[in-house]
């Protein structure tokens, strides 16, 4: 919403480093890109540090790509440019998140990530829910994000039967009706359901 955009714009303004690779973006585009990357990270429970490390490794590989007539190919140059932009955006995402902490702001994605951490760190949370509900039905499963799928697995599945493996969980969904990819939904969760929620024997 507008409030998120204002916080992101303020984070961009407060960022101390020059933005060499993002200078082509307009004052409106830059906060929008920050929010988009922040949302993508949250939906996959990835940290800026993890994506930065991956991006640097990818950059090193592209720099070693074969040359064409003594120069990098157009595709390689475009890939390097995209990586450099992402590295600067990651800096801005970190500034945005620090600003939110200073302002005491919490978004839905933050609550979602905290819920995953809670479920992973305290098995009693999942155990309590499994005692409360006899079965679980996950409707429109194609519209769940990776983070939401991880949360559900932490609550209603596990390494053994005492931690939830084999708990009666049913998912209903159609990958052809997936319409929320723009907000992190991953229709691939349907394909992974049999292994994410195996039978008590461990079989899909």
Question: Model features per residue range: what roles?
Answer:
Residues 74-192:
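Conserved helicase NTPase motor core
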Residues 1-46, 50, 188-191, 195, ...:
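Conserved P-loop NTPase-based nucleic-acid remodeling module centered on helicase motor cores
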Residues 32, 47, 51, 135, ...:
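Key residue(s) within conserved catalytic/signature motifs
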Residues 43, 50, 62, 143, ...:
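Short, conserved catalytic or interaction motifs in soluble domains
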Residues 166, 202-203:
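A generic structural signal for alpha->beta connector loops
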Residues 51-84:
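Charged, glycine/proline-rich intrinsically disordered loops and linkers
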Residues 14, 40, 44, 57, ...:
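Surface-exposed polar/charged interaction patches
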